[in-house]
């Protein structure tokens, strides 16, 4: 063993070490192939996810939003669903980046293994030289500034982000405008109302207005419809006509749209149904609340003042949007 000739192959221990290194290289090669396969399988899925974000957003929003909702609820649900989907996309991207970093680390290890010498005692020589270099470089590192990198796995969605906040604000404004357009379409929809002109007896009629019309506008149309037949309606003003729905006197400034969107409740039935129907469920099950809708009454104010102590006028009271009626009644106060 006087030199390092090309024909020298080492001792039996060296041969064992060489075989062990070859096995390690083979095992690492298999791991790298597995990481490559995982990376290639994950990428198309991410692209596919990103391409269908708008479809997923619309589907999730339709499931969350049923019937009429207020503007604030509409905007809040839309933004919450969009934020949730964006966070899921970000998590998928971070996971893919982490797998890519692990793959690059395995490649660096593989290059270092390929550079190892075949002779065992060369390890000691190189290790010694590495230690000397490390000792020489260590004082220099202490004097230089320490640079810290970013950890891609850390959650940062809670941190302030001007660009993201600007995008969210723009999305809110867009949704508000969209909501306003949709509500205008609803207000212009026709609404058929069954009512009864009440002068002690009922005279039932049907009239059509818009959902956005106020009670005052509705009573003006009623006056025009009843004027040819009833002299007292023809000679009075719209301000002296009252609209009584489910034993509540609805003030002129309220609109049908307001009653519908808030699903307002009266003393004897819902205020957002303007047809007439009976609830057949109560025949089979008396424990269920009736959902019957009764024809609203149009009354001349002078008649009401003269008969408000007599049933049914004795049950009537002014509608208050803040007052909640927990159950429907047709008798008593």
From Swiss-Prot:
Residue ranges that the Swiss-Prot or TrEMBL entry lists as coiled coil: 12-43, 70-116
Stretches with biased composition (Basic and acidic residues): 89-98, 160-171
Spans annotated as Disordered: 89-171
Biased amino acid composition, Acidic residues: 123-136
Location(s), subcellular: Nucleus
Physiological role: Involved in light regulation of the circadian clock and photomorphogenesis.
PANTHER family: PROTEIN FAM50A, XAP-5 PROTEIN-RELATED
Family as reported in the entry's similarity comment: Belongs to the FAM50 family.
The protein, known as: Protein XAP5 CIRCADIAN TIMEKEEPER
Gene it is expressed from: XCT
């Amino acid at each position: 063993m006087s030199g390092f000739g090309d024909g020298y192959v080492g001792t039996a221990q060296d041969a064992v070490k060489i075989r062990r290194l070859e096995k390690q290289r083979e095992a690492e090669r298999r791991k790298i192939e597995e990481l490559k396969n995982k990376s290639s399988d994950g990428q198309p899925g991410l692209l596919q996810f990103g391409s269908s974000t708008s479809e997923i957003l619309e589907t999730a929003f339709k499931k969350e939003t049923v019937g009429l909702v207020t503007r604030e609820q509409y905007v809040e649900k839309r933004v919450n669903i969009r934020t949730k989907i964006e966070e899921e996309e970000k998590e998928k991207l971070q996971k893919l980046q982490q797998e890519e970093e692990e793959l690059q680390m395995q490649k660096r290890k593989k290059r270092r293994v390929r550079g190892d010498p075949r002779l065992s005692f060369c390890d000691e020589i190189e290790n010694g030289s590495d230690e000397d270099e490390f000792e020489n470089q260590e004082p220099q590192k202490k004097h230089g500034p320490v640079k810290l990198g970013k950890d891609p796995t850390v959650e940062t969605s809670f941190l302030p982000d001007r660009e993201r906040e600007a995008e969210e604000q723009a999305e809110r404004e867009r949704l508000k405008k969209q909501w306003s357009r949709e509500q205008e379409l609803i207000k212009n929809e026709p609404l058929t109302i069954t009512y009864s002109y009440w002068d002690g007896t009922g005279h039932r009629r049907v009239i059509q207005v818009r959902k956005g019309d106020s009670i005052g506008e509705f009573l003006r149309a009623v006056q025009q419809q009843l004027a040819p037949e009833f002299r007292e309606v023809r000679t009075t003003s719209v301000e002296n006509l009252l609209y009584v729905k489910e034993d509540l006197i609805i003030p002129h400034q309220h609109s049908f749209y307001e009653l519908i969107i808030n699903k307002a409740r009266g003393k004897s039935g819902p205020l957002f149904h303007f047809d007439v129907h009976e609830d057949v469920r109560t025949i089979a099950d008396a424990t269920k609340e009736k959902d019957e809708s009764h024809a609203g009454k149009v009354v001349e104010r002078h008649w009401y003042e003269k008969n408000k102590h007599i049933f049914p006028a004795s049950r009537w009271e002014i509608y208050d949007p803040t007052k909640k009626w927990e159950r429907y009644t047709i008798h008593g106060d």
